[in-house]
A protein has these predicted regions:
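Short S/T/G/P-rich N-terminal loop/turn motif that feeds into the first structured element of a domain
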Residues: 1-243
Length: 243
């Protein structure tokens, strides 16, 4: 869901806000949560940040959102921190996400929970669909593993977010079919990962990708990110002072 920093936004207030939010969590179906802060003035959505929630299923997500909306403590928390971070729950985007490479396969992410990310807006060619995009993933993943030496130490992993195009979602207006995302442990690591792709993978894989989709290369959304919650490490807390 899209979020905007308010006049009281600060590292200290974010630490407090996320700590209190975590104390309100009751849904076992929540697998993870991440926050994104713009790292480029040329992002397509300007200074909009994002709060990503990963659920076990669409039904679980819908049920949890319904419960959250009627939770008096959740409403109070939202009002308490609206000048720190204001998020548009009604404008959230429903996305089906796939992450073919484990986040720590090419090195552990920082203990602070920080990560660096790039998102491309992608569109299916006429006659193509999500099925074509999913079928391409094993080919790309194989290319990644074939270049282990290049990616080592970067924490590189990637994901595809397939849009459900919910009526009020911000990505619906843009007509985005799916997002192609890359994640690393730093900006320098992203530069390294992109160099590996350009040198060793693009000539083989890009023509295959172009058979079913195109991505805007004139606008790449770049973010500093933090893990807010990890169901496999429930005691983890991010450190927003580190990047």
């Amino acid at each position: 869901m899209p979020c905007l920093a308010g006049p009281d936004y600060s590292v200290e207030n974010m630490q407090e806000m996320i700590s209190e939010w975590r104390s309100l969590l009751t849904a076992d179906d929540l697998k993870g949560a991440w926050g994104y802060v713009p790292a480029s003035e040329s992002n397509a959505f300007g200074n909009t940040g994002w709060w990503e929630l990963n659920w076990s299923s669409q039904d679980a997500a819908n049920a949890a959102w319904s419960q959250w909306a009627s939770n008096t403590e959740a409403v109070a928390w939202t009002e308490k921190y609206e000048n720190v971070l204001s998020c548009d729950a009604e404008g959230r985007n429903a996305l089906d996400a796939v992450f073919p490479v484990e986040a720590d396969h090419f090195g552990a992410l920082p203990e602070s929970g920080y990560f660096y990310s790039e998102f491309y807006h992608c569109f299916y060619n006429e006659g193509s669909s999500k099925a074509d995009a999913v079928a391409f993933l094993p080919k790309y993943t194989a290319g990644v593993y074939e270049n282990t030496d290049g990616f080592d130490g970067t924490s590189f992993h990637y994901g595809n977010y397939y849009a459900q195009l919910n009526e009020d979602g911000s990505h619906t207006e843009e007509g985005i079919d799916f997002l192609w995302a890359s994640f690393t442990n730093s900006e320098a690591s992203m530069v390294k990962a992109n160099e590996v792709f350009e040198s060793n993978m693009r000539s083989t894989l890009f023509p295959q990708f172009s058979e079913f989709a195109t991505c805007r290369e004139d606008v790449i959304d770049i973010y500093h990110g933090w893990t807010f919650y990890n169901s496999e490490q429930k005691d983890f807390m991010p450190d927003f002072s580190s990047n």
